[in-house]
Regions:
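Short coil turns that delineate tetratricopeptide repeat
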Residues: 3, 37, 71, 105, ...
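Helix-start (N-cap) detector for alpha-helical repeat units in TPR-like alpha-solenoids
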Residues: 6-7, 40-41, 74-75, 108-109, ...
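Register position in tetratricopeptide repeats
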Residues: 18, 52, 86, 120, ...
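Conserved structural position within tetratricopeptide repeats
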Residues: 30-34, 64-68, 98-102, 135-136, ...
């Protein structure tokens, strides 16, 4: 291998990433960066490796360096925001996702992550707005995940009929999603539709017999029948 060719090191690193060999991949990216320190793609890819290793602070440093060389590097902004979100730095993460949306106003990933940040900050109305904006964009990509967080937000807002509606739409594409079915069962119970809720939780018992939240819900339903 040509040790002085940064592109060869870079592509070797990308291949190693495909096999989840992140430490080896980072060595390749480091070798590439020694030759060309301004390689924004190598910096970004090194950050990706660090994300997989859950080394979020170091990953953010790599993404910042990549952004320094390429201020409109959408994926670097997106993954910096994700690293901040996973580090519970939700307000800083929101700034990154806004940068993504400035570059691409139809980024469903950014809207989804924004909704999750707002939810964790307790701003349910903003979270719901992001979900609805994401769902208004054409295409099914991420729709199940967006509908799930939308259902969680609506549940916290006490809008149980809307939770049921959102969950039903999501379940059309993902009928085996336990979390969605659990949310729907909770919404049915809290909306006073106890028999419908009971039929659904009986199905869920067969899927996850050890879920204590499910047994609490069953007890709640039986108290009201």
């Amino acid at each position: 291998m040509d040790d002085e060719n940064p592109f060869i090191w870079f592509h070797a690193g990308k291949i190693l990433m495909e096999y989840d060999l992140f430490d080896d991949a980072m060595e390749c990216f480091n070798n590439s960066l020694e030759i060309n320190p301004a390689d924004d793609m190598a910096l970004y890819s090194k950050g990706e490796c660090l994300m997989f290793k859950k080394s979020y602070t170091e990953a953010i440093t790599c993404f910042d360096l990549a952004i320094g060389f390429n201020p409109k590097y959408l994926n670097a902004w997106l993954n910096k925001g994700l690293a901040l979100k996973l580090s519970n730095n939700f307000k800083e993460a929101l700034e990154c996702f806004d940068k993504v949306l400035f570059i691409d106003h139809k980024s469903k990933d950014a809207l989804y992550f924004k909704a999750d940040c707002y939810f964790n900050l307790g701003d349910l109305n903003s979270a719901l707005k992001c979900c609805n904006e994401a769902l208004s964009i054409d295409g099914d990509y991420l729709n199940s995940e967006i509908l799930l967080i939308k259902s969680v937000v609506l549940m916290d807002l006490g809008e149980y009929s809307s939770v049921i509606e959102a969950a039903d739409i999501a379940l059309e594409n993902n009928p085996d999603d336990y979390d969605l079915k659990m949310l729907k069962a909770q919404a049915l119970a809290f909306a006073g539709k106890y028999m419908e809720a009971l039929w659904l939780v009986e199905e869920l018992v067969n899927e996850n017999h050890g879920d204590m939240e499910l047994w609490k819900l069953i007890e709640y339903i039986k108290m009201h029948i």
